Amino acid sequence: MKLIIFTGLVLFAIVSLIEAQAENEKACLPQYQVCTDAPGNCCSDLVCDCYGRYKCGARIGRNCFCLQKGVIYKREN
């Protein structure tokens, strides 16, 4: 009986470890991908930058993209 309980606990520990590893190895979002709904999923060398969208002075939405850290993007006319 003790062997069955011990075996069950060991199997449970192995399954938990496998699930934790899979969670840590989630695919990250590459550069220029939309991260509006997942701001923490950009790859390690990127940051999720968000910008407000305006039309006639009224805010109509928000866009977020995975961009390089420390890079400033300016609008060109």
UniProtKB/Swiss-Prot annotation:
It is found in: Secreted. Keywords: Disulfide bond, Secreted, Signal, Toxin. Residues 1-20 form the signal peptide. InterPro entries: Spider_toxin_CSTX_knottin. The keyword Lipid biosynthesis does not apply. Contains 4 disulfide bonds. GO terms for cellular component: extracellular region. Expressed by the venom gland. GO terms for molecular function: toxin activity. Pfam families: Toxin_35. It comes from the Eukaryota. Residues 21-26 form a propeptide. The keyword Secreted applies. Belongs to the neurotoxin 19 (CSTX) family. 08 (U8-Lctx) subfamily. This is U8-lycotoxin-Ls1a. It comes from Lycosa singoriensis (Wolf spider). The lineage of its organism: Eukaryota, Metazoa, Ecdysozoa, Arthropoda, Chelicerata.
